[in-house]
Structures are given as C-alpha cells and as structure tokens.
Amino acid sequence: MEMVHADVASLSITPCFPSSLSSSSHHHYNQQQHCIMSEDQHHSMDQTTSSDYFSLNIDNAQHLRSYYTSHREEDMNPNLSDYSNCNKKDTTVYRSCGHSSKASVSRGHWRPAEDTKLKELVAVYGPQNWNLIAEKLQGRSGKSCRLRWFNQLDPRINRRAFTEEEEERLMQAHRLYGNKWAMIARLFPGRTDNSVKNHWHVIMARKFREQSSSYRRRKTMVSLKPLINPNPHIFNDFDPTRLALTHLASSDHKQLMLPVPCFPGYDHENESPLMVDMFETQMMVGDYIAWTQEATTFDFLNQTGKSEIFERINEEKKPPFFDFLGLGTV
C-alpha cells in the first residue's frame, strides 16, 4: 500500500518538486532549494494527494454512472425526461425570441407613407446609415431601405426612355462584361443596374419578335410563290409566237393579261387538273417580268397595239408555200 502511495505521489503536481522524481529525490531536491520540509510532512502530503486523487476518480465514476443511467432510463421511458424537455422548451423559446426581430420585418410592397418617411430619414441621416434608418422605419430592414432608395426614390435616377445610342452602348457593354450589371450601370450615369438589366432583356425580346415575324413573312411568301421552272435555260428560249392568247382583257391600268404556259415543251394535255388550274390563272405582265427577269422580251407588247400583235402573230404562223405542181404563184 505504501508503494502504491509512493507511485501515486510521483504523479501529483506540486510547486516544490517535479513529478518525475521519487520521494527520496524530493527530499534531496528540497535541500538544494532550501525548502524546509520533514519526512513526516512529505508522508502526510503523499497521503493527502493520493486520497484526493482516488476520491476524485470515484466522484467522476459515480457521475458518469448516474449520467448514463439517467439517459438509459429516458430512452426506455420517455415520460421521465421532464428535465430535458424543460431545457428543450427553454432553448426553443430562446431561439424564437432571437428570431423575433427577423420575423417582424415586413416583406410586402412599399406604401406611400413609408416612401415619404424614408425620404425624410435620408434627408436627416444621409444615404449611408441604413441600419440606423431602418430602426426609425418600423418593419423594414437596412437592406430593403437601401434598395428602395437607390432603385426608386433617388432623385438622380434617369427615368427617360433609352435612346438608340444608349441601346447600342448597352449591347457592346454586355458583350464585354456579360451579366455584371453593376459595372455596366457605371457607364450610364443616372441609370440603375436594375433598369439596365431590365432594358437589356427588353431589347433581346424585341429582336426575337422581329426575327420570328420576318421568318413567318418569308415562309408565307415562299408558300404563295408560283411554281418555278426546274430548267432555267428554258427562259432563254422564250417564243412570243407560241403564246396561246385567249383574250385581251382591258382595264384602267391598260395592262396586258397573259397566260402562264408560254414556253417550249409545255404539254397542256398531259398535265394534271391541279397543275392545269394553276397554270390557267392569269398573271399581270409587270409581275411576270419581275419573275422571269427578262424585261426586254416584253417591250414590244407594251409598245404595239392589239391589231398589230394579231397581224404579226398570224403572219408568222402561216405555213411556207411549196410549189408541188410547178405552176408558180398565182
């Protein structure tokens, strides 16, 4: 038992001697340091230290045993955890009290009375002490006050519509900086970053509408355009003598009405009824010239009278004379 006490005493922390020395070396160390201490005092100190050490360990063991026992009982029977429930309720109340200030902040639309109050507070404290202003303005945070002022209430805001020059600069700035609206807004004095961002989206929506509408117009024109001849060289072989003129319609504009099928190789009988109906539709000469891009071919039709056209066509259609009997012309 004395040996155990001696070993335990070596672990004690005292200001007179280090813990690594034994009881005999303690006495020698104390003589060198001029500490007056008898062997009885050392022995009593060793006993006191060892008893305190064991009592401390016993207390810790009892505390841990009671702690685990109580938690095991709470797990087995939840009704016994009144104390823990009370603590949980207390912490819940504390947390709810800590968040009560955030819950009281209003997040709705700003009312005119609030705008007026904010203007008065900014005039007094300046546009920088937003937390102090929020304390004077019930229900609003400092961030909300700052955003409301710089985006809506600041008298330096430019509320005029964007000009074409500003729109061009905005598109160039966006190509350089991307979606960094605060940096882009610095290039437009009086414009907020929010207004710059919104107008960029307006420009993009407008361009999208224009492109889609022009695409629809082109598609409609292509669907209404007449059938194009797959052999373009046939247009160079245009022969006015093959025109099957059925009638000459006179109008106020004095434009000649011509049928479409007036090209070599056109077979009217072999066409399907749908193609015949489409080709039989009449077409204005001016539109036809624009379609074929051969305006010089039709100049004589606009300059010659109706009777001259008939006479010339009839003369060219006469078959050549062959003297089979050798009698000559009569």
Swiss-Prot record:
Superkingdom in the source lineage: Eukaryota
Residue ranges the UniProt entry marks as DNA-binding: 130-152, 181-204
Q: Its Gene Ontology biological processes?
A: organ boundary specification between lateral organs and the meristem; regulation of DNA-templated transcription
Summed up, the tissue specificity of this protein is:
Expressed in organ boundaries.
Q: Name one GO molecular function term.
A: DNA binding
Return the InterPro entries for the record: Homeodomain-like_sf (IPR009057), Myb_dom (IPR017930), MYB_TF (IPR050560), SANT/Myb (IPR001005)
Q: What Pfam families does this protein map onto?
A: Myb_DNA-binding
Cellular component terms per the entry's GO annotation:
nucleus
Q: Tell me the keywords, alphabetical order.
A: Developmental protein, DNA-binding, Nucleus, Repeat, Transcription, Transcription regulation
Question: What do mutants without this gene show?
Answer: No visible phenotype under normal growth conditions, but the double mutants lof1 and lof2 exhibit enhanced phenotypes relative to lof1.
Where's it found, cell-wise?
A: Nucleus
Tell me where in this chain the HTH myb-type domain is found: 102-153, 154-208
Q: Report if keyword Translocase is assigned.
A: no
Q: Which PANTHER family match?
A: MYB PROTEIN-RELATED, TRANSCRIPTION FACTOR MYB105-RELATED
Tell me, in a sentence or two, what this protein's role is: Probable transcription factor that involved in boundary specification, meristem initiation and maintenance, and organ patterning. Functions in both lateral organ separation and axillary meristem formation.
Q: What protein name applies here? A: Transcription factor MYB105
Q: Which organism is it from?
A: Arabidopsis thaliana
Gene behind the chain: MYB105
